[in-house]
Amino acid sequence: MKKTTLLVILDGWGYSESDYFNAIKNANTPTWDSIWQDFPRTLISASSLEVGLPRGQMGNSEVGHVNIGCGRVVYQELTKIDKAIEEKTFGNNKAICDAIDNVIQKDSNLHLMGLLSPGGVHSHEEHIFEMIKIAKQKGVKRVYLHAFLDGRDTPPRSAESSIKKTDDLLQKLNLGYIASVSGRYYAMDRDNRWDRVEKAYNAIVNADAEFVCNSALEALEESYARDQSDEFVIPTCIQKDGKLIKVEDNDSVIFMNFRADRAREISHAFTDENFDHFPKDRHLNINFTTLTEYDSKLKCNVAFPPEQPVNTLGEVLMKNHKTQLRIAETEKYPHVTFFFNGGKEDQFEGEDRILIPSPKVATYDLQPEMSAPEVTDKLVDAINNGKYDCIVCNYANSDMVGHTGNYEAAMQAIEYLDKCLARLKDAILEHDGNMFITADHGNADMMVNPKTQKPHTAHTTNLVPFVYVGHKKAQVALEHGKLSDIAPTILNVMNIAQPQEMTGKTIFKFEK
């Protein structure tokens, strides 16, 4: 029977001394309080340069899990793309040039689509603006933007500024206009809710939508009048002089999101010949280009293909003939598998995976416990049966409920998690295992913006906890640690040598 080392990632569980609408601090958490008091712990960085993002940029789940799993700072697509723009190499990118050459040669339209937002989590509006300028410089005649609106990694009603900037730029360059708008709830689903994706797809491709407006700003105003914030704007087509824009054969479409998980579904709708998740009247004969690789199975051009890290935690465990389990509910399953393995879809030898379905509710404040009880049942079973040397799990609650902006529901989510932690702690200590508890970024630690007094639905840049629970004596050996130091710490407690590719340092020193 194996003594399990368990890594618990509490998604969106940041640390803040402030109790102002801090769902984590103000919730009733007897287990967490006792763990924080009785076991070795520290705070580590999960944002900014320490995780390969631009200075001051909040972390996110994808970035967090890549850094944790790789055991080194992994420079993120946002940083890579910013660098290409800064060094003026963005416009020379082969995939981008091919998409632009296609429309120039065929006198067709260039469609840009993506999250029009300064959020920097799934996209950045500056990349879209740069793309529009490059299209103009290279002689493209018509550019149409299909804008997905945020309100999740940005304040819920903040899209007006982004739309105005885009309208001004397109007007100044006399190049085109925003041809459709959709809330990210529809265009960027990641949980197989294809009815949502269908609405966004039809608005973009077929100019077929429930609403038609004369401008993107008008569409936004009408949505607010229906009490639908940015995230939930129903896909709307924009007409100019009575004309609606469709995606036609020979057009080029460039998807400007750089994060994969919420870009996959609609990309498959554009590119899969045998797509069957909703009816399509035709298969598009277009140049479809994505800024980064969303899925290796997609038939498209990729502007910034992934760099494959070697000797990630999962790979090192496999090479040392260790068994491992990855477990999460649907919302965070890609994070403990694909992202944690450094962008590899395939399982390692000796790696098992358990996917617990997320509840089918419109928003998770309606069910703050989400699927945490089921995740915990499976975890406790796995610890008790001693099958695995290492288990990595993710609890989605503090992030997904945090994103709703519902403070009371977020506190309920934290209290559910506290009960789950009690069960895990008991199981680990009973079987003489090791448990590390951390987070990939903050969220529920600030549910209301103290400056604006409005709901805060985005991530925070706060530090996150890193705690050791077990019978070994441990001391903090590293001040100012970061997410990339977690994998070396796990290898240390498991007495496995750290490979040179892992540049992180061990956070705790354990008495042998």
From Swiss-Prot:
Substrate binds at residues 122, 152-153, 184, 190, 259-262, 332. Mn(2+) 1 binds at residues 399, 403, 459. Its EC number is 5.4.2.12. One of its GO terms (molecular function) is manganese ion binding. It catalyses: (2R)-2-phosphoglycerate = (2R)-3-phosphoglycerate. Binds 2 manganese ions per subunit. GO terms for biological process: glucose catabolic process; glycolytic process. It is an enzyme of class 5 (isomerase). SUPFAM superfamilies: 2,3-Bisphosphoglycerate-independent phosphoglycerate mutase, substrate-binding domain, Alkaline phosphatase-like. NCBIfam families: pgm_bpd_ind. This is 2,3-bisphosphoglycerate-independent phosphoglycerate mutase. It comes from Francisella philomiragia subsp. philomiragia (strain ATCC 25017 / CCUG 19701 / FSC 153 / O#319-036). The gene is gpmI.
